[in-house]
């Protein structure tokens, strides 16, 4: 189902509150639950869809990604593509049991086995770049602290030379079946085994390094190649650089969120840049050649005669490179004609002469008297 509308699947409007999302999911989950619709393939598919929608909309981070990018954020088609930039990864469809358990105390008949492989958590890291680094691209080294498999026990949690035994309560499944009576009816569900806490194993002698956790916290230095043209808010996914998975699960991803320090010279809007150029009244009237700063260095530009203050000129292709593309934005130069706040006597005389030549009316009493033999008339 391409371009899924998760709000529509739950019968909601975009922007629905957390409580509205929870109530809508609960109502539909009861209606389409497999235990109530055995053999109904359509109901089973509907149940999967509403679970998928709830898994996204109930998670603030996933919901924010969905609101910004739509369902493409989870199928790899969103984002920037190429060069390390791409859409956000798909989410763990095995999480339906956890969602249903939050309402009914169990994962339903289709819950995943909790002692199976578990994908590692994703990590988000914010990096701040200068304007120049964002424009031209840069390689950065960042330090990330994450959970990694314990090298001493290879992630088993048991001291080397010892073995973890199968949990006698759940027979290694990590779950026990429970029949619950709820206001909505009777449900046969599964719940986490209290004896082994869902792992299916009992560790009699925990690892001396990780104390039975199977993982340890480590800080790693990771090199990040940031392409030219990135901007504040861009997210760069580094696949497999998140926290390590459990019991053979795949590692999570590292999401590097970009923050760019504004330039003191340029104003950026997308891939275009804007700059002001100040010139005097005579130069605006007569035309002039000015030097304009661009991201690639200074260029000459001819301002035509009669240019008005606020006039915008475009320098095509002088903007910022588009991410993973040879295309570039444009630069816009706004001409600001400076009006002097004070004038000396000669400047005033020159302006009054200009007004006479233009046929403008003015009070001659305000005109400075011209000097005669070194003295004012």
Curated annotation (Swiss-Prot):
Protein localization: Cytoplasm
Major site of localization recorded for this protein: cytoplasm
UniProt GO BP: chaperone cofactor-dependent protein refolding; DNA replication; protein refolding; response to heat
Record domain J: where: 5-70
SMART domains linked to this entry: DnaJ
Pfam families: DnaJ, DnaJ_C, DnaJ_CXXCXGXG
Record InterPro entries: DnaJ, DnaJ_C, DnaJ_domain, DnaJ_domain_CS, HSP40/DnaJ_pept-bd, HSP_DnaJ_Cys-rich_dom, HSP_DnaJ_Cys-rich_dom_sf, J_dom_sf
Cofactor note: Binds 2 Zn(2+) ions per monomer.
Zinc finger (CR-type): 137-219
Residues that coordinate or bind Zn(2+) 1: 150, 153, 207, 210
Binding site for Zn(2+) 2: 167, 170, 193, 196
Cofactor(s) of this protein: Zn(2+)
Keyword flag Chaperone: yes
Intervals holding CXXCXGXG motif repeats: 150-157, 167-174, 193-200, 207-214
Gene Ontology CC: cytoplasm
GO molecular function: ATP binding; heat shock protein binding; unfolded protein binding; zinc ion binding
CDD domains associated with the record: DnaJ (cd06257), DnaJ_C (cd10747), DnaJ_zf (cd10719)
Protein keywords: Chaperone, Cytoplasm, DNA replication, Metal-binding, Repeat, Stress response, Zinc, Zinc-finger
Complex formation: Homodimer.
Family statement: Belongs to the DnaJ family.
Written domain comment of the UniProt record: The J domain is necessary and sufficient to stimulate DnaK ATPase activity. Zinc center 1 plays an important role in the autonomous, DnaK-independent chaperone activity of DnaJ. Zinc center 2 is essential for interaction with DnaK and for DnaJ activity.
Job of this protein: Participates actively in the response to hyperosmotic and heat shock by preventing the aggregation of stress-denatured proteins and by disaggregating proteins, also in an autonomous, DnaK-independent fashion. Unfolded proteins bind initially to DnaJ; upon interaction with the DnaJ-bound protein, DnaK hydrolyzes its bound ATP, resulting in the formation of a stable complex. GrpE releases ADP from DnaK; ATP binding to DnaK triggers the release of the substrate protein, thus completing the reaction cycle.
Name by which UniProt lists this protein: Chaperone protein DnaJ
Higher taxonomy: Bacteria, Bacillati, Bacillota, Clostridia, Eubacteriales
